[in-house]
């Protein structure tokens, strides 16, 4: 069996790869693992708004209960809310049913330990072993009072909203904010948080129907938010993705701020307050050259990890650091939460705007972004490209043309059948041509996937 877990849990097309049967076996596996430490471990389960969410939720919960675990079902709730609530409410583990920014036919299942952290690779390997044993009917099947219970608690999202609001000391009274919920997990709690802080909130894409999550909206399709911010003469636009573990922002001029810019602003705020541990902010290999240059000029150090918020978090925990994240909008404030948190991130920036009494476009001026081109090549196979001499030669040629003023980065996606080609440097047209040349070669050598 191929490895089930990718960089963000188990993810795939529902009823093709991610079936109710697999969700059931994952539940049995997780309850078996956490049951080693405690009889009847209690899990918190949350989900996003996909049509398949309730089906997978039922199967996962049934699997947990069948080996003696207990379940509390929170319903639709952001991923970072589950991470926070597991820790704050004393659950033994958590599970989130979501495929984040992916389209609605996909879904996923990821687990958190009792401290609100995603599971390390070695634990996921153990879960995979238990999944195989469950499929072979080798795991225990208790009877009588050995079977677990299921409870429903739809109020837990309000605890999370209260937590996020109290991470800042500033009222947002007088601010006009356009909020794009991506028709996802924060469609209700996002507006609750912002209005609770005193902002005037204009909501878009907060009416999920099971099929419209991330559909031309949210952080992966931010154009509508840019238009809405200017139409409403708003101070700020906030876009979450489907599970609200990331956010991108739009300033009053309709310009987008990505994760690099957001975490740099927040890191500088913490530095000025004497709260930025080791004066260091953690990015990834995808972080813009301008991010590193600006941080250095502002007296901060930067570190780059592999792409994936789990790798950013791993480094932050290892070195006891405050802020890190990804260009895509995953920003982690480890003093507040244990995973990327879109709403928590957004309110930090809104508070900064109020405290400085400056528009976001001015605050964002601390960083000059280098032009960056990214092409996603949907391939038949995303393995083996590193050893392909033709692909390697194309990359070396492009790097030679950019010299010391730029860079080329090619990597396989951890969650989709994609190879990503990124180039960065001073000239947009040159970058586009270099990226396209490499992308075309990868498509020929790796085989283009069928649409």
Q: What are these model-derived regions, one by one?
A:
Residues 13, 107-232:
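Gly/Ser/Thr-enriched, mixed-charge loops and adjacent short helices
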Residues 125-161, 166, 252-324, 332-333:
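Proline/glycine-rich low-complexity loops and linkers
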Residues 39-48, 72, 176-178, 279-285, ...:
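Short glycine-rich phosphate-binding loop at a beta-alpha junction
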Residues 32, 39-106, 192-250:
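N-terminal small/polar loop signature for handling phosphorylated ligands or for N-terminal nucleophile
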Residues 236, 273-451:
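Phosphate-binding and adjacent anionic-ligand microenvironments
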Residues 1-62, 66-68, 93, 149-177, ...:
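An N-terminal, well-structured beta->alpha segment
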Residues 111-114, 248-252, 332-334, 424:
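Short beta-strand-to-turn element immediately C-terminal to the catalytic PLP-Schiff-base lysine
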């Amino acid at each position: 069996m191929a490895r089930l877990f990718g960089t963000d849990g188990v993810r795939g097309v529902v009823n093709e790869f991610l079936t109710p049967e697999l969700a059931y076996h994952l539940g049995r596996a997780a309850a078996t693992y956490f049951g080693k430490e405690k009889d009847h471990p209690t899990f918190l389960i949350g989900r996003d708004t996909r049509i398949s969410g309730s089906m997978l939720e039922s199967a996962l919960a049934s699997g947990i209960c069948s080996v003696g675990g207990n379940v509390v079902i929170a319903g639709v709730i952001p991923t970072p809310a589950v991470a926070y609530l597991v820790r704050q409410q004393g659950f033994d583990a958590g599970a989130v049913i979501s495929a984040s920014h992916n389209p609605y036919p996909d879904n996923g299942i990821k687990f958190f330990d009792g401290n609100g952290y995603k599971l390390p690779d070695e634990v996921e390997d153990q879960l995979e072993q238990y999944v195989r044993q469950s499929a072979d009917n080798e795991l225990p099947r208790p009877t009588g009072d050995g079977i677990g219970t299921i409870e429903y608690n739809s109020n837990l999202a309000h605890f999370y909203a209260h937590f996020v609001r109290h991470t800042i000391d500033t009222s947002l009274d007088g601010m006009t904010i356009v909020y794009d919920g991506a028709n996802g997990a924060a469609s209700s709690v996002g507006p609750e948080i912002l209005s609770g802080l005193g902002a005037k909130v204009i909501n878009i894409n907060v009416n999920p129907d099971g099929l419209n999550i991330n559909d031309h909206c949210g952080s992966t399709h931010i154009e509508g938010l840019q238009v809405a911010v200017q139409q409403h003469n708003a101070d700020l636009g906030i876009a979450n993705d489907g599970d609200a573990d990331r956010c991108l922002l739009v300033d009053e001029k309709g310009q987008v701020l990505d994760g690099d810019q957001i975490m740099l602003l927040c890191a500088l705020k913490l530095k000025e307050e004497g709260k930025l541990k080791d004066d260091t902010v953690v990015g990834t290999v995808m972080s813009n050259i301008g991010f590193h240059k600006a941080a250095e000029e502002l007296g901060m150090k930067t570190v780059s990890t592999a792409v994936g918020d789990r790798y950013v978090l791993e480094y932050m925990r290892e070195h006891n650091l405050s802020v890190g994240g990804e260009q895509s909008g995953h920003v982690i404030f480890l003093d507040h939460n244990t995973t990327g948190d879109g709403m928590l991130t957004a309110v930090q920036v809104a508070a900064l705007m109020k405290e400085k009494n400056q528009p976001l476009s001015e605050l964002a001026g601390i960083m000059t972004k280098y032009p960056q081109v990214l092409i996603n090549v949907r391939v038949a196979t995303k393995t083996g490209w590193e050893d392909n001499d033709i692909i390697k030669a194309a990359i070396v040629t492009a790097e030679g043309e950019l010299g010391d003023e730029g860079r080329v980065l090619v990597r396989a996606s951890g969650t989709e059948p994609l190879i990503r080609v990124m180039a960065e440097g001073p000239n947009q047209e040159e970058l586009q041509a270099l990226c396209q040349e490499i992308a075309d070669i990868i498509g020929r050598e790796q085989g283009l996937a069928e649409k």
